[in-house]
């Protein structure tokens, strides 16, 4: 299918429904198979995502109930590196990131791949960044959208969600926005070119930590209502807001995994 169509489906799958607040909850498998539906990914894409779904099933069995997102990224990217020997690293990384994002955000792959209803379902785990589940969810959602749609759309979706949170949710959070933008950068680096895709795999293989892919969020304002946000930053085109974005981008640019 067209990359733009896939990007839209990924955005709908990951962003349309409020994310779970505790450990990832995987719904029980239906007892009666659903009526056949058209798979929206190609057979090759479906097979790749299935491989990483199975990888998650096995990996989480060895993880504690609450653990850093890195503990799942490492085995998935190791699998991607192995599979890339017979294919394109960009395709393998994209499928790995998509399967990861769907799992971490507690969604169902059936939105994208109806036949996945019969696939093994991984046990639930609470994946975190800086000990926060919401940052892991933001990071992986933006990584998947960035890997399929590119930075502008991923950044726009992340900003739209924060503005909506300011109006009626948990409040505008620059920490969440930092996770969004770091995730977008990760997704782009993993899928932009073959050299960058393989380089990322190699960096993760040689030793990996949260501090290499996710910036510190200390000092980034959070939980701002729409009124609070407007009083402090006036709007998303103000110098005050731009300075905050510049600070976030500075922190991301300094992360080791994104260095050339």
Where are these regions (language model features)?
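Intrinsically disordered, low-complexity, mixed-charge
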Residues: 2-156, 166-177, 181-260
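TRNA-recognition modules of translation machinery and tRNA-sensing kinases, especially anticodon-binding
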Residues: 162
């Amino acid at each position: 299918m067209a990359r733009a169509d896939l990007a839209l489906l990924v955005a709908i799958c990951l962003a349309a429904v409020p994310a779970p607040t505790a450990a990832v909850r995987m719904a029980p498998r239906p007892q009666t198979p659903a009526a056949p539906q058209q798979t929206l990914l190609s057979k090759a894409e479906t097979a790749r995502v299935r491989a990483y779904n199975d990888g998650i099933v096995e990996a989480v069995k060895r993880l504690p109930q609450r653990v850093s997102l890195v503990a799942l990224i490492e085995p998935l990217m190791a699998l991607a590196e192995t599979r890339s020997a017979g294919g394109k690293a960009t395709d393998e990384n994209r499928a790995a990131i998509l399967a990861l994002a769907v799992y971490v955000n507690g969604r169902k792959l059936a939105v994208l791949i109806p036949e996945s209803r019969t696939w093994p379902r991984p046990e639930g785990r609470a994946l975190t960044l800086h000990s926060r589940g919401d940052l892991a969810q933001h990071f992986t959602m933006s990584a998947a959208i960035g890997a399929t749609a590119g930075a502008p759309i991923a950044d726009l979706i992340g900003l739209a969600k924060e503005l909506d949170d300011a109006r009626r949710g948990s409040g505008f959070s620059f920490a969440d926005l930092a996770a969004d933008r770091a995730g977008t950068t990760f997704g782009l680096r993993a899928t932009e070119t073959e050299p960058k895709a393989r380089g990322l795999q190699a960096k993760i293989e040689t030793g990996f930590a949260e501090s290499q892919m996710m910036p510190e969020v200390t000092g980034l304002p959070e939980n701002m209502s729409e009124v609070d946000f407007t009083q402090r930053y006036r709007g998303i085109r103000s110098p005050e807001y731009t300075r905050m974005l510049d600070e976030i981008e500075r922190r991301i640019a300094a992360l080791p995994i994104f260095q050339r």
